[in-house]
Amino acid sequence: MNVLAYARRHGRESVAWYGGLGLLTLRVARNLQLPPSYLVIVAREIDIIGVRSLVVALTAALFTGMVLALQSAVNMAIFGAENYVGPVVALSILRELGPVLTAILVGGKVASGITAELGSMKVTEQIDALRAIGVNYIKKLIVPRVLAALVVFPLVTIMADGVGLLGGMLIVVFDRGVDPYLYWNTISYWVVMKDFLTGIGKSVVFGGLITLIGCYNGLETTGGTEGLGRSTTDTVVQVAMAVIVSDFFLTKLLLLLFW
């Protein structure tokens, strides 16, 4: 009986959460046009989301490329195909690992920070004060963060892709003895523009989704500091799950459309 009660309660909470997130998305879409004075806020959010997250994203990309190249080279050498490690690394990073790892690592950091900031404003009634004086808090607090994420996540993903490919080259050249020109030539032969654009398109969707989750959980925070801690923890988990689940559906859609 307790299990059924928990399932019903959890089901209601899940429906309410998805519905609230959808409504927030619609409200953001209706308020995308910002006054010039708000562009300063967008620039500040770009710095917070992108510049301050580069070290994490690029370090992860470097070692991901190295590990992927190492594992691929060892196994492909069995079949005499070690010269084709480059395309395997490139396709894996450009289509999947680059956008997904960037979204999970940077997104978890960014979204939890957004939840903590907006949640503290909610529990201290600052958002209620903005409403009381007639300020559109969606336009002032949410839209700049979403726009910044839509710009930053693709740019960080592009840099992560490049660093990941360089990491793969380091292993292939210095550990496996493959000519670096062969590494890049095989990549340029097998990898086409749509492989690159697939990952960039995913990163745009991930950026918007991650930011909306962080904002929504912050706005729905209740229960003081304890509730703020729960909201921040929930955001990290929900961001990771949202990226992984949406990646499957995006991959399926892109394969149907372009392959």
Question: What role is predicted for each listed range?
Answer:
Residues 48, 56, 60, 81-114, ...:
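Loop-to-helix entry region at the N-terminal start of transmembrane alpha-helices
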